[in-house]
């Protein structure tokens, strides 16, 4: 299928380095459905680019039929992220390929779910959280996130508001190097240590979803496996070139 033209409807600064983009189809037709956790292919052409550029960005919300929202981290050398952060404006048109990806939420209503992320890796998790909230997921849902500090912690309020729609939700946040202004915004300093949720690690059917830098995911997967979580209950997504955790 050819990419479809979408108009940038809204741009919001979600952290010092992450902006979200709300995108609506130029033709006004309903948008293709997707599974929470999937991504869009974003096609960008600009006179400054040597080539037509394509990047994948995770959707950050539950399917709603009328628009998409993605979040983009500004990478220092990033051609497309630089364009999205520096040049893109409301009203601009970009082309999108249909949602795709084999990392998505698959949890029966009876299954507890833990969503684990670091940095911009929270984007597919946010979509999963919205998906669980839309279904009023009856089993417990836990949100674990690691950020550098409060200025780099995106979507904190949205996570709290969305989690509040679930019957059994709790979240825990680690800041590696908190700022003075961060008091009260995080639970622990340093790197993510799953011993704080030790009781969840031995639940027989709990599903764990991970997204973040490769080193982070290896670190978390090792903690999960050491705690006895079965390999088949650990689901992960690697941003960038795919490597095996």
How would you label these PLM feature ranges?
Residues 112-123:
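Short, glycine-rich nucleotide/cofactor-binding loops
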């Amino acid at each position: 299928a050819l990419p479809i033209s979408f108009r940038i409807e809204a741009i919001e600064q979600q952290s010092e380095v992450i902006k979200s983009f709300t995108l609506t189809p130029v033709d006004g037709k309903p948008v293709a459905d997707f599974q929470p956790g999937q991504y869009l292919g974003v096609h960008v052409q600009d006179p400054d680019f040597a080539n037509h550029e394509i990047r994948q960005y995770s959707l950050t919300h539950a399917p709603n039929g009328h628009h998409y929202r993605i979040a983009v981290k500004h990478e220092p050398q990033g051609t497309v992220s630089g364009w999205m952060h520096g040049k893109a404006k409301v009203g601009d048109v970009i082309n999108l390929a249909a949602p795709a990806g084999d990392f998505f939420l698959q949890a029966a209503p009876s299954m507890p779910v833990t969503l684990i992320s670091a940095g911009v890796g929270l984007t597919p998790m946010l979509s999963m959280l919205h998906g669980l909230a839309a279904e009023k997921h009856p089993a417990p849902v836990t949100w674990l996130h690691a950020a550098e500090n409060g200025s780099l912690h995106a979507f904190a309020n949205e996570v709290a508001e969305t989690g509040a729609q679930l019957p059994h939700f709790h979240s825990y946040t680690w800041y590696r190097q908190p700022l003075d202004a961060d008091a009260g915004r995080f639970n622990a300093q340093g790197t993510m240590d799953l011993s704080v949720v030790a009781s969840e690690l031995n639940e027989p059917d709990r599903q764990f979803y991970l997204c973040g830098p490769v080193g982070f995911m290896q670190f978390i997967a090792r903690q999960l496996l050491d705690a006895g979580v079965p390999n088949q209950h650990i689901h992960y997504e690697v941003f960038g070139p795919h490597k095996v955790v």
